[in-house]
């Protein structure tokens, strides 16, 4: 029985919104990013890159959890965006998500902003 525990397969655990802000694509994942839901973020990120957006702003303010699979999705998008002359900017990480980036050292390879306005102004 699925009790909605971390790591369990449950539809609707991650919702992703995408919108354009100037020359940036703003991608907002809401919920849990893990091995069950990673493709729900990977596909919109790749779609943005295919549409010519090399500057991706990922608004993490509604992201409740991120495991190593989710981190790899973001790292892959970063490499693709940088090879196209852009990058991936992370915004508003919750402490539990920021800790994953801190522990793995991934916070050193992403540009991290406190607010969406700050990310879009850069």
What are these regions (language model features)?
Residues 33-110:
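Amphipathic alpha-helical interaction surfaces in cytosolic regulatory modules
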Residues 7, 27-28, 50, 101:
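N-terminal non-cleavable signal-anchor helices
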Residues 117-122:
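A charged, well-structured terminal subsegment
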Residues 4, 14-16, 24-25, 55, ...:
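Residue-level marker of intrinsically disordered, low-complexity segments enriched
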Residues 9-43:
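STAS-typified acidic loop motif
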Residues 1-9:
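N-terminal acidic, proline/glycine-rich, low-complexity intrinsically disordered segments
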Residues 113-115:
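Short acidic low-complexity segments
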């Amino acid at each position: 029985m699925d009790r909605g525990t971390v790591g369990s397969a449950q539809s609707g655990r991650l919702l992703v919104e995408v919108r354009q802000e100037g020359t940036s694509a703003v991608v907002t994942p809401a919920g849990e990013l893990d091995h069950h839901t990673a493709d729900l973020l990977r596909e919109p990120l790749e779609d943005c890159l295919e549409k010519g957006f090399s500057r991706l702003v990922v608004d993490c303010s509604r992201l409740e959890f991120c495991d190593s699979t989710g981190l790899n999705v973001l790292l892959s998008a970063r490499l693709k965006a940088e090879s196209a002359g852009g990058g991936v900017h992370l915004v508003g990480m919750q402490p539990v998500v920021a800790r994953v980036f801190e522990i793995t050292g991934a916070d050193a390879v992403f540009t991290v902003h406190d607010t969406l306005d700050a990310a879009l102004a850069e």
